[in-house]
C-alpha cells in the first residue's frame, strides 16, 4: 500500500510537486536526481488529462492511468560507468462524453511509453563526475517529447575549488534550451565564495516526464562568507555572509532582487 499525498491548497499558477512514494520508482531514484529535475516519475500513472473535449460533459474517467508494465535497471559496468534505465508503458484511458442526448467514448490519455536513461562516469578524482541523461515520451498517434541533458560535478584542490551544473535541450512541438552552473572556492580555514548563473528560454519544456516550475527565466548571484572556527575570547566562533541574487522573467522584467547580510 502506498502512502497518500498530503492535502495541498495551491492558489498559485504553478503545479504542485509531489514526492514519489511507490517503491518501484523511489528505490534508486537519487541516481537520476538533479537540480533541474528531468525525471518526475509521478508523471507515469498520473491522472489522465492529455486530451480535453471542446464541449460536453466527460464522465467515467479513471482517477489514474493504468501502468501495463515497467522495467528498471541500475548498476555499474566493469569499467566504472554507472548506468540507470527505466521504461514504463501505460494503457489508453477513455471516458464517456455527453453532448446533448449523444454519448460517445472519448480518449483522454493515449497509450504512452515513458523511457529514461542515464550514464555517469567519475573523472579526474573521487570528487568529480560527468553524466548524460535522456528521457523520451512516446504517445500513440500523438505528439511526444524528449530531453537530453549533460550534468557535471567537479572538485579540485581537495574539493576546495568546485563547480557543478547542467546543460539541457528539450524537444516537444518546439525545441528549448536551458543551463545552470555555479562555481566556488572554499578556503580550508576562514572564507568561501560562490557564483551562479542560469537560464531557461521561453520554449524550454520538460514537463512531459520532468518537473519545471516555470520557464522563460534567467538568474544570477554570488555569495561571500568569512568564518572563524577557532574561539576568540568568550566567542566560540563567528561568521559573516553577504549574498546577492537576481531573477529576470519575460521581457527582462525583474522578478527578484535580493541582498542579504548575515552575521552569527
Where are these regions (language model features)?
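Flexible, surface-exposed loop regions and adjacent strand-edge segments
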Residues: 8-14, 100-110, 149, 182, ...
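Flexible, solvent-exposed coil segments and beta strand-coil junctions
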Residues: 45-54, 95-100, 127-134, 157-166, ...
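Extracellular loop and loop/strand-boundary signature of outer-membrane beta-barrel proteins
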Residues: 56-59, 95, 100-106, 135-138, ...
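Exposed, low-structure sequence patches enriched in small/polar residues
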Residues: 66-68, 74, 145, 158, ...
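Surface-exposed extracellular loop regions of Gram-negative outer-membrane beta-barrel proteins
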Residues: 114-171, 230, 237-241
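Conserved structural-core and active-site-/substrate-pathway-adjacent residues in large, well-folded domains
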Residues: 1, 73, 119, 149-152, ...
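Active-site substrate-binding loop specific to GH73 endo-beta-N-acetylglucosaminidase modules
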Residues: 81-116, 122-125, 129-134
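Residues that cap or anchor secondary-structure elements
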Residues: 2-75, 85
